[in-house]
Amino acid sequence: MGTNIHIDMVIHGKHTAEIRKMFNRVAQAYDRTNLVLSFLQDAHWRRAACKMLGVTAGEEVLDVGAGTGASTRTVARTGAAVTGIDISPRMLQIARNRCKRFQNITWRLTNGDLPFPDKSFDAILMVFCLRNVSNIQGFLCDAARVLKPGGRLVVCEFSHPRRFVAPFYRLYLRYVLPRLAKLISSDPAAYEYLTESIEDWYEVDELAFMLEQCGFQNTSWKRLSFGAVALHRALRGPE
C-alpha cells in the first residue's frame, strides 16, 4: 500500500499545532472532565471498545490518540504489546506517569500520522480521536496499510442519536455541555470545539462506507448510550 502519509489535522479552522496546544491545555483535567460531561459513561465506552477489539496476549496493538492512556491500560492488561501514540506531549507525559507498571506499553509522540512500516499491527484502536483528522478516509487507508492482513480496527466515536433522543442530545451539546465545561474545564473553548466536531461528524453508515473504500471488510457497528456513541469494527482484507 505504499509508504505512510502525513495527514494534517485541519478541522473547524484548527491545524495540528493548534489542536496539540488545545489538548496540552486540557490534559491535566481531561479524564475528570470527560467523566463528568459523559455522566460517568466515558469509562464504559472505552471498555466496550477494547472488548470489541478482542485483543489476546502477544499481539501487536496500536492505540491511536492514546491521550492519558485510559484505553491503553485496558488493552495492555491483556498481555499484548501496545504502542500508544498522540500529538500532545502533555497527554503522553500523564500517560507515562500513570502506566509505569506496564512494561508492555511503548509511547510515541506523532504529528497526526502513522509513522510505521506496512503490516506492523494485529489490531488498531481509535477512541475519540478520528474526529480531529481532516482527511478521514486518507487516515483510515493509512491505518489499513499498517495493519496485518486480517487485522482488526475498532473506532469509538460520538454519533447522532435518532428519534426521540436526538433533540435532547442537541440541547445538551449546544447549551448544557458548554456551561458545564466552564465550571470544570481548564479550557472551556476546547469543549465548544468538541460540540462542533460532534455535530459535523458522519452517520454510522457513512463511516462504514469509508472503511470499505479503504479495503476493510466485515464492517459492523454498535450504538451505545441511545446512539450518543458508536463503535465500528472492521477487518483489513487479505493481500
UniProtKB/Swiss-Prot annotation:
The gene is menG. Methyltransferase required for the conversion of demethylmenaquinol (DMKH2) to menaquinol (MKH2). Its EC number is 2.1.1.163. The lineage of its organism: Bacteria, Bacillati, Actinomycetota, Actinomycetes, Micrococcales. It catalyses: a 2-demethylmenaquinol + S-adenosyl-L-methionine = a menaquinol + S-adenosyl-L-homocysteine + H(+). It comes from the Bacteria. Keywords: Menaquinone biosynthesis, Methyltransferase, S-adenosyl-L-methionine, Transferase. GO terms for biological process: menaquinone biosynthetic process; methylation. Belongs to the class I-like SAM-binding methyltransferase superfamily. MenG/UbiE family. Pathway: Quinol/quinone metabolism; menaquinone biosynthesis; menaquinol from 1,4-dihydroxy-2-naphthoate: step 2/2. It is an enzyme of class 2 (transferase). Disulfide bonds: none annotated. CDD domains: AdoMet_MTases. One of its GO terms (molecular function) is demethylmenaquinone methyltransferase activity. InterPro entries: SAM-dependent_MTases_sf, UbiE/COQ5_MeTrFase, UbiE/COQ5_MeTrFase_CS. This is Demethylmenaquinone methyltransferase. S-adenosyl-L-methionine binds at residues 68, 86, 111-112.
